[in-house]
């Protein structure tokens, strides 16, 4: 065994051994317990960042630990390879997105391998390859024929300069991010998944996921947004509107119906269109609303604006005339594009009514009383007894709901209804680098799905987009085709699918990545699925995780999988954060400096109190800790860390610095500490091995001192097993190993028993570290005399008899203050303990001249003598 620990050599040797033996390639083994551990696959952006390293290390520690428990562990990896960044990079560098993507995958794969991850690379999937997306197209055609996918007009952000559709996040202050042109709202035909058909099940089966963080389940519940309410119809005022009809609204607060003082409609509503005829000012306002953001989050924060129409509707119960307003806060796609406004009990209506001097009528007695003041109070939105509501006065929320519903049903002007916030999922993207939508538009037959024997519809890979619309729409060689039904000239769909589609089923494809008879091989899929442990960032809590759950149910209903949910347990890892440093630039902006280029000064408590740039020695401002990012220039390159310290040190630091679900603050001194610790383990093992391996430990002949050492070893095994196995608290498990190392380094090395005990301790340390620092553990295990590789060793078991203590040390307090210690046999009675405590030399000094009133004994811990 080399005297010096050289991570580069140790890690290369371990990785070569794993590659040669294909240590992580798994097959279905009926009868052996499976464990499917999956980290969210990366987008091949070019380089791994520390967030990736943390995510994949957490997954790897769990996978390796489960393997040590004797399970058949699947840990695959792939590439979420379609998407806009590739198009943007392609335009910037004048290179085809395919070339850019495949080069990035090659580089990032070598980076992942250098981390020593226990990945079955034979199952690698790349979503931009036809052998992957052909099955997505196959499922699309099946679902289209069943009506689960349909086509309708949808509102999009249209950039008139680039002639393209922009995502909400590409619209900055109403302008296109690339062209700077004012964005228009456009209606274009798009394809939609009927996810709303599954809304109830998606909501209810969250209760089948006890292994998910409550926070994520709450976010999904809110996103699905089930609300029970009432559909209320306000009859048209024929004098102003000119014809019969009713305005439908949905409300979750029908108890406040008697407080409605106006109604508001969306800019796209037919009543808005009618009112704008011959009213140029109203038409201009409607156009302004239509050009605003279509994102709900923006709507919530934007200024509430409205304009009166000359139209009125009638209150369904009183017949009173209520004015119709057009308002920018009403969404056409929620409810029916209209709301009844109750300013006294809804904050948004309250703001709007105050802005435009509309009446406010209180109809609920709240904790703030019967009246509503000029400033909004949260209490105004409470449920309470009805007032100013005629026959409904005195009723509570439920009583009013039922009575008002009955009154509306009698007049045929309302009924109770369940509503969801969730909308159907529009998947059409006017982009090039995505999965082609397998539809042919025929002038006679309409939309015809591409027949199975003509799949995949292959995306041409030698295209460099220019940002002006989709290049596919300008490629007759791509879109010109014949109708599969009637044989006439037809046109292929040039939109591609939302890239969330690829990541909604990849976890199932890993079970049979080379299967060529369907989306998945049902036998293999049901062998591995559902995923036992899924690991990824909280930012995917809603969209990705909801779409993946939806797709799993689609696959189940197609007979491909039998389970209801894709991921049994979910771990959302925290961010990696680091210090930021900047100087204010001449233009008022900030120039950010990488922490590696900054010299810092700390106070006695290690708090940073000053910072200077290394190049010029001048001060820089301290910006505080933030998530590692390019924009703040506070990232640390994982590759340089691996080259400097080795992968095991990086892995150890990341697992020790914080629990996996909390933010991890990068610290160079922490990395140094991890490196020092591994060198200590190596040194102790090297000195031990150099003397030749010892014989068997004779447990029956251990001295008291040796029993204490062995107790420390097995206490650490017990605690680490709980920390890793039950709670994923790798940081506290590592702390246990460090405690044992402190004991082993001080342990005497005189007798054969001493050396045999150290052997047991070093083996325990090696096994406990094996999932976290696999390379050094691989070498240590070999040097400690084992022929079988550490990856095939089992997790250490606790010898409970080693934890039994013959004697215990109790602290003795007098009136709550520590005054001494007594060592007692573990089986000593309460009376014996009390007598020993009273007669302790130091205790006698502090009780001299006092009367002992009471003695409290806490077995195994302390004795408190109360005296005065």
Swiss-Prot record:
Residue spans crossing the bilayer: none
SUPFAM superfamilies: Anticodon-binding domain of a subclass of class I aminoacyl-tRNA synthetases, Nucleotidylyl transferase, ValRS/IleRS/LeuRS editing domain
CDD domains xrefs: Anticodon_Ia_Leu_BEm, LeuRS_core
Domain of life according to the entry: Bacteria
GO molecular function: aminoacyl-tRNA deacylase activity; ATP binding; leucine-tRNA ligase activity
Keywords linked to the UniProt accession: Aminoacyl-tRNA synthetase, ATP-binding, Cytoplasm, Ligase, Nucleotide-binding, Protein biosynthesis
UniProt motif 'HIGH' region: location: 42-52
Keyword Transferase tagged: no
GO terms under biological process: leucyl-tRNA aminoacylation
Record EC number: 6.1.1.4
Motif ('KMSKS' region) on chain: 627-631
Reaction it catalyzes: tRNA(Leu) + L-leucine + ATP = L-leucyl-tRNA(Leu) + AMP + diphosphate
Annotated positions binding ATP: 630
GO cellular component: cytosol
Stored PROSITE patterns: AA_TRNA_LIGASE_I
Any Pfam family hit: tRNA-synt_1
UniProt-annotated location(s): Cytoplasm
Coiled coil: none
Assigned protein family: Belongs to the class-I aminoacyl-tRNA synthetase family.
Protein name, UniProt field: Leucine--tRNA ligase
Organism ancestry: Bacteria, Pseudomonadati, Pseudomonadota, Gammaproteobacteria, Pseudomonadales
């Amino acid at each position: 065994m080399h005297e010096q620990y050289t991570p580069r050599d140790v890690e290369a040797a371990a990785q070569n051994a794993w590659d040669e033996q294909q240590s992580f390639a798994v097959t279905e083994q009926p009868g052996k317990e499976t464990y499917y551990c999956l980290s969210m696959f990366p987008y091949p952006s070019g380089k791994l960042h520390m967030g990736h390293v943390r995510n994949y290390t957490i997954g790897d520690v769990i996978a390796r630990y489960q393997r040590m428990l004797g399970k058949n562990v699947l840990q695959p990896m792939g590439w979420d390879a379609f998407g806009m960044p590739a198009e943007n990079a392609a335009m910037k560098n004048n290179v085809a997105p395919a070339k850019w993507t495949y080069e990035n995958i090659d580089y990032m794969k070598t980076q992942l391998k250098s981390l020593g991850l226990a990945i079955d690379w034979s199952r690698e999937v790349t979503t931009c390859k036809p052998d992957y997306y052909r099955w997505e197209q196959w499922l699309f055609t099946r679902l289209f024929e069943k009506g689960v996918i349909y086509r309708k007009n949808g509102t999009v952000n249209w950039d008139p300069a680039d002639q393209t559709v922009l995502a909400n996040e590409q619209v900055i202050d109403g302008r296109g991010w690339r062209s700077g042109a004012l964005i228009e709202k456009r209606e274009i035909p798009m394809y939609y998944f009927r996810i709303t058909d599954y809304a109830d099940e998606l909501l209810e089966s969250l209760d089948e996921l006890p292994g998910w963080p409550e926070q994520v389940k709450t976010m999904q519940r809110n996103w699905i947004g089930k609300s029970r309410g009432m559909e209320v119809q306000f009859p048209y005022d024929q004098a102003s509107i000119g014809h019969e009809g009713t305005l439908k609204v949905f409300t979750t607060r029908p108890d406040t119906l008697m407080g409605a003082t106006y109604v508001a409609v969306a800019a796209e509503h037919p009543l808005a269109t009618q009112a704008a005829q011959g009213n140029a000012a109203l038409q201009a306002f409607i156009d302004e609303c239509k050009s605003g953001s279509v994102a709900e989050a923006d709507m919530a924060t934007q200024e509430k604006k409205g304009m009166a129409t000359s139209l009125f509707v009638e209150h369904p119960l009183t017949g009173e005339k209520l004015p119709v307003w057009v308002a920018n806060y009403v969404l056409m796609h929620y409810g029916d594009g209209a709301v009844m406004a109750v300013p006294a009990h809804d904050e948004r209506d309250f703001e709007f009514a105050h802005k435009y001097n509309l009446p406010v009528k209180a109809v609920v007695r709240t904790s703030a009383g019967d009246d509503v003041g000029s400033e909004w109070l949260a209490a105004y939105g409470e449920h309470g007894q009805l007032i100013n509501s005629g026959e409904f006065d005195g009723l509570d929320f439920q009583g009013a709901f039922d009575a008002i519903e009955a009154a509306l049903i009698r007049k045929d002007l309302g009924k109770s209804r369940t509503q969801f916030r969730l909308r159907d999922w529009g998947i059409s993207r006017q982009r090039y680098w995505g999965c082609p939508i397998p539809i042919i538009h025929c002038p006679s037959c309409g939309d015809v799905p591409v027949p199975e024997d003509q799949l995949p519809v292959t995306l041409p890979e030698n295209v460099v987009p220019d940002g002006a619309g989709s290049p596919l729409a300008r490629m007759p060689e791509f879109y010109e085709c014949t109708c599969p039904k009637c044989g006439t000239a037809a046109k292929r769909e040039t939109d591609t699918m939302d890239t969330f589609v690829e990541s909604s089923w990849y976890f199932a494809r890993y079970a049979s990545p080379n299967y060529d008879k369907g989306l998945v091989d049902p036998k293999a899929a049901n062998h591995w699925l559902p995923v036992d442990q899924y690991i990824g960032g909280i930012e995917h809590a809603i969209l990705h995780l909801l779409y993946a759950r939806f797709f799993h149910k689609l696959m189940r209903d197609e007979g491909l999988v039998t389970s209801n949910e894709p991921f049994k347990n979910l771990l959302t890892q925290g961010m990696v954060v680091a210090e930021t440093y900047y100087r204010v630039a001449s233009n008022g902006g900030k120039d950010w400096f990488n922490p590696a280029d900054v010299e810092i000064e700390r106070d006695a408590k290690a708090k940073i109190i000053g910072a200077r740039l290394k190049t010029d020695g001048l001060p820089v401002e301290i910006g505080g800790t933030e998530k590692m990012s390019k924009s703040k220039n506070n990232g640390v390159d994982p590759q340089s860390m691996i080259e400097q310290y080795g992968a095991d040190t990086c892995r150890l630091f990341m697992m020790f610095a914080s629990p996996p679900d909390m933010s991890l603050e990068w610290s160079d001194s922490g990395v140094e500490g991890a490196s020092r610790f591994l060198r200590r383990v190596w040194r102790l093992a090297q000195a031990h091995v150099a003397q030749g391996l010892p014989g068997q430990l004779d447990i029956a002949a251990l001295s008291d001192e040796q029993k204490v050492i062995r107790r420390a070893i097995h206490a650490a095994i017990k605690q680490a097993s709980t920390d890793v196995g039950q709670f994923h608290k790798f940081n506290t498990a590592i702390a246990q190993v460090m405690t044992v190392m402190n004991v082993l380094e001080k342990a005497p090395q005189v007798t054969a028993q001493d050396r045999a005990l150290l052997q047991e301790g070093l083996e325990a340390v090696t096994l406990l570290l094996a999932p976290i620092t696999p390379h050094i553990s691989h070498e240590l295990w070999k040097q400690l005399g084992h022929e079988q590789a550490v990856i095939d060793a089992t997790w250490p078991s606790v010898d409970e008899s080693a934890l039994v203590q013959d004697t215990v040390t109790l602290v003795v307090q007098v009136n709550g203050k520590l005054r001494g210690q007594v060592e007692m046999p573990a089986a000593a009675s309460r009376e014996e303990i009390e007598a020993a405590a009273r007669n302790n030399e130091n205790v006698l000094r502090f009780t001299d001249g006092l009367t002992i009133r009471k003695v409290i004994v806490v077995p195994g811990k302390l004795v408190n003598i109360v005296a005065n």
